[in-house]
From Swiss-Prot:
PROSITE patterns in the record: CLU, TPR, TPR_REGION
Keywords: Cytoplasm, Repeat, TPR repeat
Region annotation (Disordered) ranges: 1-36, 83-103, 724-760, 1358-1407
Single biological process term from Gene Ontology: mitochondrion organization
Protein name per UniProt: Clustered mitochondria protein
Bias kind Basic and acidic residues: ranges: 1362-1382
Pfam families: CLU (PF13236), CLU_N (PF15044), eIF3_p135 (PF12807), GSKIP_dom (PF05303), TPR_12 (PF13424)
Main location: cytoplasm
Annotated GO CC locations: cytoplasm
Domain of life: Eukaryota
Effect of gene knockout: Causes mitochondria to cluster within cells. Reduced proportion of the cellular volume devoted to chloroplasts leading to an abnormal chloroplasts distributions. Lower levels of chlorophyll, especially in plants lacking REC1, REC2, REC3 and FMT/CLU.
Length: 1407
């Protein structure tokens, strides 16, 4: 951080890591106590209830969607008073004598005298550091361009304290007593700080750091429109424009360009600011304080040469090629560069003010930089012009890969381990420790990313250049790099040319070296196909190593350390980046090896002190202490995998490395090719909890003596099912269910049972070395018992977890939208992706899930093949190779010889394409300059065509996932969602234009715009905040809004301090805070929190991530709750666009969103549009889920309500009858929802009878007037013909429109299928004697021509009566819907599972 000059350079290295190179900006001060956290919004008057309230309260499932459920949460009016509003917060805080809860911070006002002499005020906490204050000042518009200053603190007594950067305020003075003030005093610049000042000035002048969200733009446009309408003389818009959702859902490829937000137009304030070629200052000028020279060209066209000194910036007299350091005649100078430019140029002053106003108008989170931004697979099309930018060129040329880095490099390992040694006994100490760890780890990942690109691009030389290339290792910026090569492709390429299909090439035989795992004596010949056993860091095991490292980091055992680690996939290569182990590069590491083995168990090292530390971690990770025998028949007691390496570094710390098998091997995969198929840690946790709960239940029943033991075993699968629900808290589409939902017990009972069984849970441990080649010690019974334990948990995965996961998918308890969320759901349940083939076979009957699994298998198989292509091509062929691959994958590219077939020439092409003639250990040789290109033709990748590629994909899927890809997979893959998935997995960015997937070659080389690395890392998470969120979710599910609000607020405050606002977990907190405020009736507060979540999701997850789509959907519902329906519909349109890109139009969440859109139009009275969306939702659910699924019943019920609002009570009764039939079949007669549906049917039937009776009464009342009117008309025959012509014309047009479906224009954005569906409904209604008017009027009997005259005469009276009747029906309907909100599901209120979300939770609540 460029703040001070020389005074803070000698601080502790461990502390400097928390603030060095700080790029994350706090958007606001840490959250105040709960009472003060509720946004201070104006009271909402006449706010209509949200869509969901007509049917049911809304609760918060784990993916953040609003879902209609029954009364799991009390009504808002019952709980709203428990959450303090903004106007109550001050008095409540003053009267609260209790200590602040964890994560809550008391803020105190402190005045600041700025460097320019102005005054401002900050809200500070005694625990804030001086660096925090500097960051606050850097964010404030008044002080944002001051970077080099000292801070002085004056207390109430007049004492002055100089603040060092790493001081906490509480260490210097007590600001809680008041009367304290801060003063910014100019400090002297040095070479580093003045360059940082110039860099800061450039950033301030650019809007590139402003990431505007579409939600913000929509809100600003809506407010502007409202203000315009409120002006005198302006007429308000009478209608809300209809969305084009149904249209673009049918043209997803055409909507790609809509995803990219239009970037903010740059406001030019200066032509350029560049470092002058007079730099560096000559020695005699250095002696008088010159540090830097800048060349500036203003918008007026004036050129200035500016001198930066230790004190000021001024314009010198240089005009040509000779430096004239004297100040110019104008004498302009200032303490900052921005201040000087404001004096030099009036246009700069105006533009700078506009830039600052633009940034100030944005949401604070939009100005915050994300530490690890996601990869964007779409780029602006047409590609914007690339303009000259001297400053950009300077920054690009300062990147150093191979040369010596300027200045002192960061010692990542020392920083990381020092942060881990921070004290963490008090909550505030834990926050500071977590913050330091997060910052160091994030900086490491960023540095590893740049270093890996340099390694793969051959910009960084290896440290062992004389070794074979497959063994090359690299060190750059104190980070160790090594390659991990995937040999799954070799399995395919070697099987075909050899024609020996009986011998399988091991999928785990992959080549690479990690730090300290190479044995050069056994690698003199890299051409040998057999692989050396101790080369462990293969493509697959790198993932396992990363997972093991995370587990030991979470265990956090004092005295046991792990290296920082990241995995970078780029251009087909997988690079493993690790912090450098102290002393490893200076000597032989075998001398320091104290634990584990470097030669696969031939020699095992053991140390008592090391074993004690490892054993402590093993108890937390369910690893059993067991015996292993080495080659010398010596028995060792280990509590870790044999191949792990315990090393004491030169810093005397105990490091544990190579943690590929922290969890036991999967007993379902025991072949030699599956030695790195291990179980996931989530599964181990779930199994241990299930086992301990079963034991505790058995003990309880034994104590009661009332049950036999057979019941216990019968409950095993139920216990497992319940635990799976609890584990899948990150990917489930419904709220996390406790085991009590499955066992008919209360949450308190489960908590008590969990505490009782925690001890037995910890006692469950597994031997990680069973089913391996290592020789195990102990007797045969013990070894058999260890193997049986692993077999038991493997069987638990196949027999309990997988069936339960498939069941959750089918019932929409878990509803993944794309490949990423499917993978997250699998992992959250403890299921490895290699089981995805079994999942696919289990969901064949559901088209959307079948396609999702099918496409994920296809994309994962294609990813490995594309990576193999990228590994073997040169830099200049990347764009054409990627476009050719996409054409073969999505198009129908054929080689010049015609259609390819599985003959010998094809096999030869395949062999050449995959490089099968190259030995496995030569993979990655493309990194060598010119080595590969000399041995293969220029366009070897052009030898493949669509048939060859798909044949390889099918074979890969069969070998890797044990799944036979059907021929249909080529057709189902022609989707934007598949293209998106593939691009994200490989790191490809393409142009955002419409692609014709029916063409043979849909892609061109110019469509490939970028190739970025894909990264996996071990950045720690804040476990305390995560636990608080889980507790808050439990409270929210039980309706305890005030308590849940407290938990979520505490978690939000902690995460803000640890990670800053740009983090996924912060978004989760904002989502749940929005849910709580929504339930409490504070719509404006809910929108404020939801807006935060949306911005964070866009920045941290991506513009088109499913969570981002759900955020837009929830935002729309909140806006609708404030009667801002136009803005709500715009957000719904964005949600549908994103859902179309991520999942495609065929997904139940899309149907649920259609229902929500229909409810909005229904509340606006646009019944024709509402019916179109409801009909389309019904068709989707019937096609995707079946005609008897509960979600289909939801659609029928929504249609029944819509027809009821139109007065078509007969149609309402018919649709509700279908709802009732489905619920009876799925839930039974006794279920509350079934009874509710029956009540609705009775209500609709009663209203139909009432309407008929009212109609007959009206006809009788008007009978007497009829004759009088006829007599009148007989006296005026000319009126009869006029009335007859007018009535016949109007009626004929209306009937034709209803039958033919011509009531909507056939234009852009109009869905003809929906129109035909709506027309069909009207046609059937007309056939039954009803005319359903598109305008939502009351249906009237289709009159024969002879009765037209009487109908015309009575039009006014009958319409009046019917209008009143219909109006009463609508009011009554709304009232009853509101009254029955707890039990009657009008429609799902969000993007999710809808009616089925919390079935068992609701049943429990009713019990």
């Amino acid at each position: 951080m460029a703040g001070k000059s020389n005074k803070s350079k000698a601080k502790r290295a461990a502390q400097s890591t928390t603030t060095n190179s700080t790029t994350d900006v706090k958007s606001d001060a840490p959250a105040p106590p709960v009472a003060a956290t509720v946004p201070a919004t104006a009271p909402v008057t006449a706010a209509a209830a949200p869509v969901a309230t007509a049917a049911a309260p809304v609760t918060a499932p784990d993916n953040g969607t609003l879902t209609a459920v029954d009364s799991a949460v009390p009504e808002a009016n019952e709980v709203a008073p428990t959450i303090p509003k903004a106007d109550e917060s001050e008095s409540q805080v003053e009267n609260n004598d209790a200590q602040p809860k964890q994560g809550e911070l008391r803020l105190y006002p402190v005045s600041v005298k700025t460097q320019s002499g102005g005054k401002m005020e900050l809200q500070l906490n005694p625990g804030d550091s001086v660096m925090d204050i500097r960051q606050f000042l850097l964010d404030a518009p008044e002080t944002c361009y001051f970077t080099c200053y000292e801070l002085l603190l004056r207390n109430k007594d007049g004492e002055t304290h100089h603040l060092e950067d790493y001081n906490e305020i509480s260490e210097v003075a007590d600001i809680t007593i008041g009367g304290c003030s801060l003063e910014m005093v100019a400090a002297l610049y040095d070479d580093r700080s003045i360059r940082a000042h110039v860099h800061r000035a450039r950033d301030l002048l650019s809007l590139s750091t402003l990431h505007s969200s579409l939600s913000t733009t929509l809100a600003l446009q809506y407010d502007a429109a409202l203000n315009k309408v409120q002006n005198p003389g302006d007429k308000p818009k009478s209608d809300v424009p209809e969305l084009e959702c149904l249209g673009f859902m049918e043209d997803v490829p055409g909507s790609l360009k809509k995803l990219i937000n239009s970037t903010s137009e740059e406001i030019r304030s200066v032509e350029n600011i560049v470092f002058s070629s007079f730099n560096p200052p000559p020695s005699h000028r250095r002696l008088v304080g010159d540090l830097i020279y800048l060349d500036v060209v203003t918008l007026e066209g004036n050129k200035y040469c500016i001198t930066g000194t230790t004190k000021t910036f001024y314009v010198n007299s240089s005009s040509g090629n000779i430096l004239d350091p004297r100040p110019s005649k104008s004498g302009f100078e200032a303490a900052t560069l921005i201040g000087l430019l404001q004096k030099l140029s009036s246009k700069f002053k105006k533009a700078f003010r506009e830039v600052m106003e633009k940034k100030a108008s944005a949401h604070p989170f939009e100005n915050v930089q994300s530490l690890l931004p996601p990869h964007s697979w779409l780029r602006t099309y047409p590609v914007p012009d690339h303009k000259r930018d001297a400053a950009r060129a300077e920054e690009a040329l300062t990147i150093s890969y191979g040369s010596e880095l300027i200045g002192m490099q960061r010692d990542w390992n020392e920083e990381l381990q020092s942060c881990r040694e921070f004290p963490h006994t008090s909550p505030q100490e834990r926050i500071l420790r977590d913050r330091a760890l997060y910052k160091v780890s994030s900086d490491f990942v960023d540095a590893a990313l740049n270093g890996a690109i340099g390694v793969i691009s051959r910009c960084i030389p290896p440290i062992n250049p004389t070794d074979p290339e497959c063994l090359h290792m690299y060190v750059h910026n104190n980070i160790f790099f090594s390659f991990a090569v995937d040999a799954d492709i070799e399995q395919l390429s070697k099987k075909r040319p050899s024609n020996q299909m009986t011998e399988k090439v091991s999928s785990s035989e992959k080549v690479s070296c990690t730090e300290g795992t190479c044995d050069n004596e056994e690698h003199n010949n890299c051409n040998e196909a057999p692989l050396v056993e101790n080369e462990q860091a293969t493509y697959a095991s790198a993932n396992n190593d990363l997972k093991g490292t995370k587990l030991y980091q979470e265990a956090d055992v004092p005295g046991l350390y792990n290296l920082a680690m990241a995995i970078i996939d780029y251009r087909g290569h997988r690079v493993v980046a690790q912090s450098v182990l102290p002393g490893i590069l200076q000597g032989d590491k075998s001398d320091a090896l104290l634990y584990g083995s470097v030669d696969n168990g031939k020699k095992i090292c053991w140390n008592e002190d090391f074993h004690a530390k490892v054993l402590e971690a093993a108890k937390l990770l369910h690893i059993k202490e067991h015996s292993v025998i080495d080659a010398s028949e010596t028995v060792f007691k280990l509590a870790a995998p044999v191949e792990c390496k315990g090393i004491v570094g030169s810093d005397n710390r105990h490091y544990l490395l190579d943690l590929m098998r922290v969890t036991p091997r999967d007993a379902n995969y025991t072949g030699p090719e599956s030695r790195f198929c291990v179980l996931r840690p989530e599964l181990i946790t779930s199994f241990c909890q299930a086992e301990s709960l079963e034991k505790s239940k058995f003990k309880t029943k034994a104590d009661e003596g009332g049950d036999d033991s057979s019941n216990v075993s019968a409950d095993t699968s139920k216990v497992g099912d319940a635990l799976i629900d609890g584990e899948a808290n990150g990917a489930s589409n419904s709220d996390q269910k406790s085991i009590s939902d499955k066992q008919n017990t209360t949450a308190e009972d489960y908590a008590a049972g969990s505490s009782e069984s925690s001890k037995s849970c910890d006692q469950i441990a597994f031997n990680p070395n069973v089913f391996t080649d290592f020789t195990l010690g102990g007797n045969q019974e013990e070894i058999a018992a260890d193997e049986e334990n692993v077999k038991k948990v493997s069987s638990y995965l196949v027999d309990v977890v997988l069936p339960k996961f498939i069941e959750d998918l089918c019932t929409l308890e878990v509803s993944p939208m794309d490949g990423q969320t499917l993978t997250e759901a699998l992992h959250a349940h403890g299921v490895n992706v290699r089981y995805i083939g079994r999942v696919a076979n289990g969901v064949k009957h559901l088209p959307h899930l079948w396609d999702l699994c099918l496409n994920e298998i296809t994309v994962r198989s294609a990813k490995h093949i594309l990576k193999d292509i990228l590994r073997d091509i040169e830099d200049h062929d990347i764009g054409s190779a990627v476009s050719h691959f996409l054409n073969c994958f999505f198009g129908n590219y054929q080689t010049a010889g015609g259609k390819a077939s599985a003959n010998s020439s094809t096999a030869k092409n395949q062999k050449k394409f995959f490089g099968a003639d190259q030995p496995i250990t030569k993979k990655g040789q493309g990194r060598g300059k010119g080595k590969a290109s000399s041995k293969k033709s220029f366009s070897s990748y052009m030898m493949v065509d669509s048939n060859i590629l798909w044949s390889d994909i099918q074979e890969f899927a069969k070998a890797k996932y044990e799944f036979e890809l059907p021929e249909l997979s080529r057709t189902t893959a022609k989707k934007v969602s598949v293209l998106r998935n593939l691009c994200q997995k490989v790191g490809v960015s393409i142009a955002a234009r419409k692609y014709d997937f029916s063409a043979n070659t849909p892609f061109e080389t110019s469509d490939i715009l970028d190739l970025r690395p894909v990264i996996k890392h071990s950045v720690p998470v804040c476990s305390e905040a995560k636990d608080l969120v889980e507790m808050g979710k439990v409270q929210l599910a039980e309706g305890m809004l005030s308590e849940s609000y407290t938990f979520f607020s505490e978690a939000f405050s902690i995460l803000q301090q640890v990670t800053g606002p740009m983090h996924r977990e912060v978004a989760n907190c904002c989502r749940y805070l929005a849910m709580v405020l929504y339930h409490a009736g504070d719509m404006a507060g809910a929108i404020m929190q939801q807006h935060k979540e949306l911005i964070i999701n866009e920045r941290c997850l991506g513009l088109d991530h499913p969570d981002t789509a759900h955020s837009y959907g929830n935002m729309a519902l909140f806006y609708h709750g404030l009667n801002q329906t136009e803005l709500a519909l715009q957000n719904m349109g964005r949600a549908l666009l994103l859902l179309g890109l991520s999942s495609g139009p065929d997904h139940p969440d899309v149907a649920a969103t259609f229902i929500n859109v229909a409810m909005m139009y229904q509340d606006m009275g646009k019944m024709d549009t509402a019916l179109r969306y409801l009909q389309e939702a019904l068709k989707k659910n019937e096609r995707l889920l079946g005609p008897e699924h509960i979600q289909t019943a939801v659609c029928y019920h929504a249609l029944a309500i819509a027809f009821n609002c139109m007065g078509a009570f007969k149609l309402s009764h018919q649709h509700e009858k279908k709802t009732y039939d489905i619920l009876v079949k799925q839930l039974g007669d006794d279920d509350s929802r079934t009874r509710d549906s029956l009540n609705w049917m009775k209500t609709f039937k009663m209203r139909e009878l009432q309407m008929t009776a009212q109609k007959q009464k009206g006809q009788a009342a008007n009978a007497a007037n009829t004759q009088k009117a006829i007599d009148l008309l007989k006296a005026h025959p000319d009126l009869i013909h006029a009335f007859q012509n007018a009535a016949a014309t109007g009626r004929t047009n209306a009937l034709n429109s209803a039958v033919l479906g011509e009531t909507q224009p056939r234009g852009r954005g109009f869905d003809e299928r929906a129109a035909r569906a709506a027309a069909e409904v009207r046609k059937k209604a007309a056939a039954k004697g009803l005319l359903v008017r598109p305008q939502g009027g009351v249906p009237v009997q289709a009159m024969p021509p002879l009765s037209q005259l009487q109908n015309m005469i009575n039009t006014a009276t009958v319409s009046s009566e019917k209008g009143g009747e219909n109006g009463e029906a609508k009011v009554q309907e709304k009232k009853e819907s509101s009254e029955n909100g707890k039990t009657e599901n009008l429609a799902p209120a969000g993007l999710g599972a809808g009616l089925t979300s919390l079935d068992k939770k609701k049943q429990k609540a009713k019990k």
